[in-house]
């Protein structure tokens, strides 16, 4: 089907690098296909990239602040008590949804890409517009029903949970929790705002991030979930990750041109600062390790010490290019981060801070190109042991094989096709 020129409104969670870059890459692909695309975000530290990509934008108020984002991250990582409320008042939710509705009324889109901008889960159903979300495969109900969802290591607070309770039991627990009313306590103000607009409440995460069409920027070989087993309304595209249009700093080239093992480290925008500091301190202690680190937004690079001839840290780097230069990568397991490394064919040591990140790393473990260290087990000896093992030729060989398969896909092109066809098919 050849679409007429469609207008798409793009929303994303502008503080979350993974969600934001997936939205941005998809919007760029939408424009390249001849469609119209415009961004509407409630603030976010990454929003400057929208104009740099040549896409129209309108910032909406009230904004979701950085301080609110930090609390949301702690909720997602189980760093705070389960049931901790989202740090957004009923009034703010209503005002954010009203701002969405005003923007949508002015733009008159044919469809809305909602990302993880949660006010869209109020405004878009109220406006009765077609809504597309793009989420990790762990948020597909089938993934949970098939008991593939492992307990987050951050919930395993003691020896019994970590070492004694069998994995299959923990997966059954997570199934019951996630498909029940697990988010009810966290979503009180959100549901009060939905009630204000005449919408029913949402009590779990899978329903919270579900669109009329939900795209999984993933592949069965990575997630472990067959395409034919997906819940109705969920479809795979293929990996989507940022290829930042940034130059490689000369410092990176200088560090990686030294003799020794080249290591790239990044814990994305959701890793713990203290964990990143421990990793870098451990790596610096080994003279033949050459280390490049992208800190993103979790800390100031200066907190890791001065740059030297074998260590360089900065906030952002073109990760797809730096990964290609590295012998191994130490990562947090965010979907885009993992997929970038798979595209580059670089063996991975992964440390997941959320269940989704654990699942992403485990996908590469199954393919023989990664080792995962549970967050509770991160220590200098464990890190060094993993580096020794991941440097074996079998991991390199497997990583190259995965690279070939990933590069044969085009997740952006497929997502754009799915989105446009969804809107056109629902017009008929």
What are the roles of these predicted feature ranges?
Residues 105, 206-208, 256, 322-323:
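Solvent-exposed alpha-helices and their adjacent loops that cap or buttress functional pockets
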Residues 132-224, 231-232:
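Active-site-proximal region of nucleotide-activated glycan assembly enzymes
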Residues 83-88, 104, 186-190, 262-269:
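Short, basic, glycine/proline-bearing loop/turn elements
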Residues 1-2, 203-207, 253-256:
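Short boundary motifs at domain starts and secondary-structure transition points
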Residues 218-328:
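Donor-nucleotide binding loops and adjacent catalytic segments primarily
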Residues 1-164, 289-345, 349-428:
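Glycosyltransferase specificity loop/lid
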């Amino acid at each position: 089907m050849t679409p007429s020129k469609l207008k798409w409104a793009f929303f994303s969670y502008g503080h979350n690098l993974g969600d934001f870059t997936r939205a941005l890459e998809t919007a760029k692909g939408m424009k390249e296909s001849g469609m119209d695309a415009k961004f509407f975000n409630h603030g976010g530290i990454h929003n400057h990239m929208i104009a740099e990509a040549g896409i129209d934008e309108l910032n909406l108020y009230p904004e979701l602040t950085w301080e609110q984002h930090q609390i949301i991250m702690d909720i997602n990582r189980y760093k705070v008590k389960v049931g901790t409320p989202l740090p957004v008042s009923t009034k703010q939710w209503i005002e954010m949804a009203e701002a969405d509705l005003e923007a949508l009324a002015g733009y008159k889109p044919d469809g809305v890409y909602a990302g993880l901008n949660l006010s869209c889960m109020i405004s878009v159903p109220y406006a009765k517009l077609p809504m597309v979300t793009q989420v990790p495969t762990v948020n597909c109900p089938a993934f949970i029903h098939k008991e593939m969802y492992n307990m987050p290591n951050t919930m395993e607070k003691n020896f019994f949970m970590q070492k004694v309770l069998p994995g299959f039991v923990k997966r059954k627990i997570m199934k019951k929790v996630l498909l029940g009313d697990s988010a009810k306590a966290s979503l009180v103000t959100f549901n009060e705002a939905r009630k204000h607009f005449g919408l029913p409440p949402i009590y779990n995460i899978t329903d919270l991030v579900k669109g009329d069409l939900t795209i999984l920027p993933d592949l069965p070989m990575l997630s472990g979930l067959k395409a034919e087993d997906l819940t109705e309304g969920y479809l795979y595209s293929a990996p989507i990750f940022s290829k930042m249009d940034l130059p490689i700093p000369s410092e990176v080239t200088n560090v990686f041109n030294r003799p020794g093992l080249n290591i790239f480290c990044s814990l994305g925008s959701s890793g713990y600062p203290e964990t990143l500091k421990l990793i870098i301190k451990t790596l610096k202690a080994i003279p033949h390790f050459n280390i490049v680190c992208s800190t993103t937004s979790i800390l100031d690079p200066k907190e890791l010490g001065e740059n030297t001839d074998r260590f360089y840290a900065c906030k952002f780097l073109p990760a797809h290019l730096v990964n290609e230069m590295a012998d191994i990568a130490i990562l947090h397991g965010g979907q885009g981060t993992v997929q970038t490394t798979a595209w580059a064919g670089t063996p991975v040591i992964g440390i997941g801070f959320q269940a989704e990140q654990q699942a992403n790393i485990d996908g590469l473990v199954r393919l023989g190109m990664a080792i995962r260290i549970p967050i509770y087990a991160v220590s200098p000896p464990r890190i060094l042991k993993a580096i020794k093992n991941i440097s074996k030729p079998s991991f390199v060989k497997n990583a190259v094989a995965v690279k070939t398969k990933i590069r044969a896909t085009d997740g952006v092109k497929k997502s754009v096709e799915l989105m446009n066809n969804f809107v056109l098919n629902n017009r008929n």
